[in-house]
Regions:
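A residue-level marker of the well-folded mature domains of exported/periplasmic proteins
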Residues: 24-334
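Bacterial N-terminal signal peptides
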Residues: 7-19
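Positively charged n-region of N-terminal signal peptides that target proteins for export
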Residues: 1-4
Length: 334
């Protein structure tokens, strides 16, 4: 009898662990990337890095799909759902319509969408306060500029990208009320995210007008912006991931969105049975948004510049500085 009792007690820790192990085995995460692919050195790649970190930590593989055209998004989401993948991450606002359709078809599965909101009982939407980080980027650009003229190159002309541009302009004028801010959008279709040649052309045009710092929020198109700025001896500003290393000494900073952390956290919560539908908003206050400072830009960002930007960050978090969000009313001050 005593031997049986000891055997039962020894088995308890193993039995207690079984639900967790089963849950870890049940999760089958997947990602459908946006146009530009998972190695765009920007938005998609940050998501991919988060998935890689999750796999490294848990040994759970993440199935990935890179669409080559607009029509493949819904098909990819549906195919992954039919395979029982869950949670499925849809990368980018362009997937909102497709995700709304597919999530309704598979109500027992979990979905995550980045950069827009889809209201459904099985969807978690993760959005960012891009206007806050763009404001800081604009401040730094104006502080660094020798001409008082700075530029912005966006990808697809949509409210989200105008949100970046609006925050950038507000920050630039906060640092220098006389600053001129040039703005160009690459196009009106998703191909605008993957046209570095056009990005370079728009950058050179702004440089010819006197801009010496250009911020890009344009996916793979932005790589052309950074290249053109570096070639001309000017400064670019990276976006989404830390792009400072692409042209050391010529990328003033990068406005980083911690998409990697957001995705890794979403997968981990699902694995632990804590998936929560609804909207999650990340900004400066929780380090969901930040500027990148490292050895690659240390020599071009002075201590005085850094101090002013750091103070502005604190003031935004404290509510002393209110950065207007373009998407609240589709307008921008100034």
């Amino acid at each position: 009898m005593r031997r049986l009792l000891l055997s039962a007690l020894c088995a308890l820790p193993v039995m207690a662990a079984l639900p967790v192990l089963a849950l870890a085995e049940e999760i089958k995460p997947a990602i459908v990337f946006d146009m530009g692919g998972k190695f765009d050195k920007s938005f998609n790649e940050s998501v991919h890095n988060g998935a890689q970190a999750f796999t490294k930590e848990t040994s759970i593989e993440v199935r990935e799909f890179e669409p080559q055209n607009d029509t493949q998004r819904e098909q990819a989401l549906r195919n992954l759902a039919r395979r029982g993948q869950t949670p499925i991450v849809a990368v980018g606002f362009n997937q909102a319509s497709a995700l709304k359709t597919v999530s309704a078809e598979f109500p027992k599965l979990h979905f995550v969408i980045l950069d827009t909101v889809v209201e459904a009982p099985n969807v978690q939407s993760i959005v960012f306060r891009e206007e806050q980080g763009s404001y800081l980027a604009g401040m730094l650009a104006a502080l660094r500029s020798g001409t008082g003229k700075v530029g912005f190159v966006g990808g697809m002309d949509v409210p989200l990208i105008r949100k970046f541009a609006c925050g950038y302009g507000q920050g630039a004028r906060a640092a220098n009320p006389k600053a001129e801010v040039f703005q160009n959008m690459t196009g009106s279709t998703p191909t605008a995210w993957n046209d570095p040649v056009r990005g370079a052309e728009l950058t050179r045009s702004q440089i010819e007008r006197g801009a010496d710092v250009i911020f890009q929020a344009a996916g793979a198109t932005g790589l052309g912006v950074l290249q053109a700025a570096a070639d001309a001896g000017k400064y670019g500003i990276g976006v989404d991931s830390n792009q400072n290393h692409l042209h050391p000494g010529h990328v003033l900073t990068s406005m980083v969105k911690r998409l990697d952390v957001a995705v890794q956290k979403a997968f981990q919560e699902a694995r632990e049975g804590r998936f929560t539908p609804g909207t999650r908003v990340l900004g400066l206050e929780d380090d969901g948004i930040s500027l990148a400072f490292d050895d690659n830009n240390a020599k071009i960002v002075t201590a005085e510049m850094r101090a002013k930007v750091d103070q502005a960050r604190q003031d935004i978090v404290a509510g002393k500085i209110k950065v207007h969000d373009y998407m609240t009313d589709n307008s921008c001050p100034n």
